[in-house]
Amino acid sequence: MTMPVGSSIKPLTVYAPAIDLGASPASIAYNMPVPISGWKDSSGKDSWPKNYGGGGYKGPQSFRSALRNSYNTAAAQILMTYVGVSRSVEYLHLMGIPDKNINADPFGLALGSSGLTPVQMAVAFGTIANKGVYQQPLSFSRIVDSNGNVVVDMHQQQDRHQVFKPSTAYLVVDMLKEAVQSGTGTKAKISSQVVAGKTGTNSDSKGVFFAGMTGWYSGSVWIGHDNYKALSSKATGGNAAAPLWQSFMEKIHKAKNLDSREIIDGTPSDYNLVRVTPCGVSGQLATDACYNDVNGYKTITDYWSADSVPTAYCSMHKSVSVCTESGLLATDYCPSYSVETRGIVLIPRGHPLYDYIDAYGDTIRKYLGEFATLKSTNDIANHICQIHDAYTAAQQPSDLQNIVSDASNLVYTAYQLVGSAPDLSNDTRRQINTAISAVQTLLSLSPIDYTSLEGAVSNLRSQLQAAGLM
């Protein structure tokens, strides 16, 4: 049986190779409906694969998040940008998988149209669990004669060799544990055992897959018809294959009375791994602009092999004064309360998204902001706030800035006071929190209603005074 294994292949052909080549769980993939260079559609044009269900586009995502949620677009982008088809195939060869089981193209490697057998998948996942060391599968261990003499010892002939670095294996196991704890493989959990694994769903519903590991065993399961008739469209690796895998693996561990143990023992430092905080958009070392991203993207802190830690600082963020009401460059007419220093995103030449700025500008702006489609920093000055001008500035009450400042400070003070007053009754606490929310809501509006905000501030102050906090 060599039916396609679906997304179960991603750790073997995409994530582990990328990390082995210098990436990290914190590296960034672009989970966006934008073409991927080298990913061709039927007409030969650059395209991208859809995520399961057709949605799930999240913009820049860490490898860890993309694997946990099994996003196809991210996996395809990682394969084509970080690994390459030929190197991905080489890793499969090192895990004992012959060419006849490999579709050596982007679709076969990133999305699992390759037809690996359950044994091959169990061995490959076992390679990761065994600190990156492949062990040739054996159907018997030895042959002895009637006198107990060993005639054949298969362990002496067994092929063993390193495929992935131990540090790579450690990180990938950690990522796969998350896929079971909170991702697509939650139904593979075994009580009192550490479990890591990956689901797979064939694109035409002809089979579903789960491959996983514990501290004791690796195993895989495929569910499908022997005539390859399509399963129910509702069948997935997560809701069908994972629970079946869980059922027989749990029985094995209980029958052998096996205690829980880590799949790979040791600590990150044992594998020369260090924690690094890169930008959540570029994957390079974070700058102040990254921490203040105007689109709300955050930095990511995760482990990296010490010999491949990024050394370059983010080349995609630039700090500018932004009007928070329009999201564009602030002008002299923007009220000071709406002006903040934020990091905007610019796509540098050579970036995987750069060549698609013209044709997919609207999509890129949706995920990366208004400035992301500018090809020159000189163009930034043309993207100024259109909400505030001389007329709107003249209409603003002279003391609006003061009430906004007072409101912001009062909200902060209220949180501090409530947090340091454990004896408040539930009703009083609820009333104060409601008053805080009212002020915050009015502060978020554009334009700000001066009269309403003034009333909300007065109410919050009264609530705090009534509670004896002011």
Question: Whereabouts are the PLM-identified features?
Answer:
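A penicillin-recognizing enzyme superfamily signal
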Residues: 1, 5, 115-123, 127-316, ...
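Active-site SXXK
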Residues: 4-31, 66, 124-128, 172, ...
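Conserved catalytic neighborhood of penicillin-recognizing serine enzymes
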Residues: 23-88, 134, 146-178
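Structural recognition of the beta-strand scaffold that forms the well-ordered cores
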Residues: 28, 65, 75-79, 91, ...
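Mid-domain, small-residue-enriched loop/turn segments at the edges of structured enzyme/sensor domains
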Residues: 43-51, 82-123
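Low-complexity, Gly/Ser/Thr/Pro-rich intrinsically disordered linker/tail segments
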Residues: 272-398
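Repeat-associated, polar segments at repeat-unit boundaries in modular proteins
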Residues: 380, 385-391, 395-397, 439, ...
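Amphipathic, heptad-repeat alpha-helical segments
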Residues: 396-446, 467
